[in-house]
Swiss-Prot record:
This is Methionine import ATP-binding protein MetN 1. Transmembrane segments: none annotated. The gene is metN1. It comes from Oenococcus oeni (strain ATCC BAA-331 / PSU-1). Residues 12-251 form the ABC transporter domain. The complex is composed of two ATP-binding proteins (MetN), two transmembrane proteins (MetI) and a solute-binding protein (MetQ). The keyword Cell membrane applies.
Length: 350
């Protein structure tokens, strides 16, 4: 008998999930008392280094990994309390794609996409019709008769995505699905996933170790370390103001600000002998990323500046600008106006 839980907006609720692996020597706590809620239609990212517990956690969503403790609620149903027959029904509504495409080399593209439908009571004509619809959806309608060996990595992943959608799932789990792809192909796959999210109202749970992937596609993110979620929230909030060291490290890999600061401090050519300089890192968000705050500062305080580093990221549709500036001028100007200058800067931080 299915155990129904009132969940109006959340399609996934993981409550107090713990996964223990035991051997003769020790007990490994792969997932440690994790709570996670994913809203219907969201693109939710889970980021962490290898061994953080990301894959183990998401495999509990369809009980491919049964948790030692905790509740797994999908579409309002506590799926730990249902029988195998009903669990198969739930699993049909959860598609999965992986880093390795796992296509069958002996089957054509069409045959690979049809495969999940073979255990359904669907005749051959309808199976093929569904597979052709999916091929068109992922942009591979010209490769119906091709075999996996004839496809590029990006094309293989598109076939894998189409296959994962065969049973009209409401949830798609993406486990490092772009890790084996080059940057250009990764971008095209992420664009496809965003498109599918909008067209099908498909909830996507995406695992990655790359912040670039998170900022490109996700609306919300959880950061994992040692089996725990250590930080969670909107991607823009996490990107603007990470509170944990691991999160900051991931953000730094995407912005390159940390490396730029180290390079600037180390390099003497940025220093002007006899001139007082102050190095400032500015972060601009939203509309302020396009405002002329620096020119306003220069005009108001008669202070010179040199832009040593600048870039603008787009995170979940929001512009976030990063700038490292060396302000220079007479000591008295710098000292007398420094607090006013900082006030102007921080007024434009958010």
């Amino acid at each position: 008998m299915a155990a129904f839980i009132n969940s109006k907006t959340n399609i996934i609720d993981l409550k107090n999930i713990t996964v223990l692996f035991k051997n003769q020597r020790k007990e490994v706590r792969a997932v440690d008392n994790v709570n996670l809620a994913v809203e219907r239609g969201d693109i939710f990212g889970i980021i962490g280094y290898s061994g953080a517990g990301k894959s183990t956690l998401v495999r509990t969503i369809n009980l491919l990994q049964k948790p030692t403790n905790g509740s797994v609620i999908v579409n309002g149903i506590d799926i730990k309390k249902i029988d195998e027959k009903n669990l198969r029904v739930v699993r049909h509504k959860i598609g999965m794609i992986f880093q390795h495409f796992n296509l069958m080399s002996s089957r054509s593209v069409l045959g690979n996409i049809e495969y999940p439908l073979l255990d359904q009571k669907i005749n051959r004509k309808k199976r093929q019709q569904r597979a052709l619809e999916l091929l068109k959806l992922v942009g591979l309608q010209e490769y119906v008769s091709a075999y996996p060996s004839q496809l590029s990595g990006g094309q293989k992943q598109r076939v894998a995505i189409a296959r994962a959608l065969a049973n009209n799932p409401e949830i798609l789990i993406s486990d490092e699905s772009t890790s084996a792809l080059d940057p250009k192909t990764t971008e095209s796959i992420l664009e496809l996933l965003k498109d599918l999210n909008k067209k099908l109202n498909l909830t996507i749970v995406l695992i990655t170790h790359e912040m670039q992937v998170i900022k490109s596609i996700c609306h919300n993110v959880a950061v994992m370390e040692s089996g725990k979620i250590i930080e969670e929230g909107k991607v823009t909030d996490i990107f603007i103001d990470p509170s944990r060291e691991v999160t900051q490290d991931f953000v730094d890999t995407s912005t390159n600000v940390k490396n730029a600061i180290k390079r600037i401090i180390k390099n003497t050519k940025f220093k002007i002998p006899g001139i007082n300089q102050e190095l400032v890192y500015l972060k601009f968000v939203g509309q302020s990323a396009n405002e002329g705050i620096i020119s306003k500062i220069v005009k108001k305080f008669r202070i010179s500046f040199n832009i040593l580093f600048a870039n603008v990221d787009q995170v979940d549709g929001e512009d976030i600008g990063h700038m490292i500036i060396a302000f220079s001028g007479e000591d008295s100007l710098i000292k007398n106006h420094w607090m006013h200058l900082l006030k102007m800067v921080f007024e434009h931080k958010y």
